[in-house]
């Protein structure tokens, strides 16, 4: 695969979809930097066992100074930054059988602010401080976790997920704007979610189960490997004509989604 020997930064790589992606990119021969506030020993060990180089960098992406230092550390260690995957986020488990987040009338301002600071501002910080290195190379790929629209108001699973969806739709708009700014520097910036690609069986299962999903919830969810597959590896090789778009992968090919 074209990501072999590429330097790939995965924020939020200690767990969830980020951890799955770390293993997939390691298997494809990439050089990994895992940026997370959570302990990274487990994923670093998994990546090393796959024969890949890995650099864990403890970082709170809400803190711009920490992010700036993290990008400097990765560049100093590897000499370049080829791919940034902005995976780190506070995720609502509204489809995992966990307690719902509060609806707006019951939500503390501090809760709302923390989700926006992590999901949206964290993506901004990481993108901002990776771009100068990519501009220097005149090449790079940035993959943001965003979505092009909000959930159907009739979907009961969307209740309590308001601020999460606000953050992800905002990331979609952010992607379009930054992609336009960086096109002349040959930096491809796309937005995509873990699902929305290959058709899934209509068996009543909702959400995506990862290594950290409680066993009692896994039967009602789809396993991350069956849903995500290699879509982020494909996105890390996306052509410039897709930059700025919401994309997914179907039948092993990247597809532009309608806004």
Say what each PLM segment does:
Residues 109, 141-170, 175-176, 180-184, ...:
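Catalytic loop of short-chain dehydrogenase/reductase
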Residues 95-104, 108-113:
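Substrate-binding pocket helix/loop in short-chain dehydrogenase/reductase
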Residues 127-128, 176:
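A short, exposed helix-loop element centered on a Lys and neighboring polar residues
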Residues 58-71, 109:
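The beta1-alpha1 cofactor-binding region of Rossmann-like NAD(H)/NADP(H)-dependent oxidoreductases
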Residues 184-185, 191-192, 208-259:
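C-terminal helical subdomain
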């Amino acid at each position: 695969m074209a990501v072999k020997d590429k330097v790939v930064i995965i924020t939020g790589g200690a767990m969830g979809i980020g951890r799955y992606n770390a293993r997939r990119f390691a298997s494809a021969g990439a050089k990994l930097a895992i940026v997370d506030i959570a302990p990274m020993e487990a994923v670093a060990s998994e990546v090393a066992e796959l024969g890949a180089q890995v650099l864990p960098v403890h970082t709170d992406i809400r803190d711009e100074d920490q992010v700036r230092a993290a990008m400097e550390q990765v560049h100093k260690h590897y000499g370049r930054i080829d791919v940034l995957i902005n995976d780190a986020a506070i995720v609502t488990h509204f489809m995992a059988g966990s307690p719902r987040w509060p609806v707006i009338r019951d939500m503390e301002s501090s809760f709302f602010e923390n989700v926006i600071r992590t999901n949206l501002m964290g993506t901004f910080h990481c993108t901002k401080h990776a771009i100068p290195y990519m501009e220097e190379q005149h090449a790079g790929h940035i993959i943001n976790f965003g979505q092009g629209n909000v959930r159907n108001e009739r979907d009961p699973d969307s209740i309590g997920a308001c601020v999460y969806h606000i953050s992800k739709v905002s990331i979609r708009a952010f992607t379009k704007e930054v992609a336009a700014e960086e096109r002349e520097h040959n930096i491809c910036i796309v937005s995509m979610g873990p699902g929305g690609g290959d058709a899934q069986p209509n068996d009543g299962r909702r959400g995506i189960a990862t290594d950290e999903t409680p066993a009692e919830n896994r039967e009602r969810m789809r396993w991350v490997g069956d849903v995500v597959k290699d879509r982020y590896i494909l996105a890390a090789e996306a052509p410039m004509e897709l930059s700025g778009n919401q994309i997914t992968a179907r039948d092993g090919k990247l597809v532009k989604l309608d806004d």
